[in-house]
């Protein structure tokens, strides 16, 4: 969430009903209290029910605070590099960080690497991608643009709604949204591809 620029979290709702709460919603409330998130707002891209924008830097700070409050010892810039296990039970993991290697013993380990690092090192069977060819979903590639005239963007959307097919059912979302996220410019993109200004598959 904080490293890849994926923007908002989606979604905490199924229609009008909030279905995700717990510690995740506690995090959002804390972010809102510090001005790092507007909270749950309706989705203007048309992908889902609601989105929850947040400041990546603000979230880093708040997650760190929550960990400190819970008594968690954080190991920065560290990765698991080896696992000691016996009879399908992990006894310890070896972590490599800025201060070298460190052995950590525990009765329980949770693999939160996102890549099955711990499971793989422990000899468990892991799979990558879809069964047919092992290919994975393409990663989202985002970048930030500053000093955008959002009023002009909204005006363009309202006057060129064929460029934004996901918004056709309710263009009023564009003017009502506290934060604007859109998927579109489809004709502009096709024209740029056709003229060779951009090229991708």
Range-by-range predicted roles:
Residues 88, 113, 136-140:
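Short, solvent-exposed loop/turn segments at the edges of secondary structure
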Residues 87-93:
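Short, hydrophobic/aromatic-rich segments at coil-to-beta transitions
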Residues 1-82, 86, 137:
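Conserved N-terminal/central alpha/beta ligand/cofactor-binding core
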Residues 74-76, 111-112, 120:
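General beta-strand structural signal in soluble alpha/beta enzymes
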Residues 91, 102, 116:
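Glycine-centered loop/turn positions within well-structured domains
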Residues 97-108, 113:
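Core beta-strand elements of the Rossmann-like FAD/NAD(P) dinucleotide-binding domain
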Residues 2, 9, 118-201:
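Rossmann-like dinucleotide-binding core of oxidoreductases
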């Amino acid at each position: 969430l904080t490293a890849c620029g994926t923007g908002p979290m989606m979604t905490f709702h199924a229609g009008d009903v909030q279905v995700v709460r717990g510690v995740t919603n506690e995090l959002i409330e804390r972010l809102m209290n510090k001005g790092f998130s507007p909270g749950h707002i309706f989705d203007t891209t048309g992908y889902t029910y609601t989105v929850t924008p947040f400041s990546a830097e603000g979230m880093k700070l708040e997650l760190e605070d929550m960990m400190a409050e819970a008594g968690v010892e954080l190991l920065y810039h560290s990765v698991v590099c080896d696992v000691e296990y016996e009879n399908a039970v992990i006894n310890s993991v070896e972590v490599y960080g800025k201060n070298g290697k460190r052995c950590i013993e525990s009765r329980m380990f949770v693999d939160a690497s996102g890549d099955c690092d711990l499971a793989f090192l422990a000899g468990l069977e892991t799979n990558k991608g879809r069964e047919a060819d092992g290919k994975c979903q393409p990663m989202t590639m985002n970048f930030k643009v500053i000093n955008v005239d959002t009023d002009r963007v909204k005006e363009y959307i309202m006057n060129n709604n064929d460029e934004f097919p996901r918004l056709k059912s309710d263009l009023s979302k564009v003017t009502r949204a506290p934060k604007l996220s859109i998927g579109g410019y489809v004709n502009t993109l096709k024209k740029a591809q056709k003229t060779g200004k951009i090229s991708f598959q």
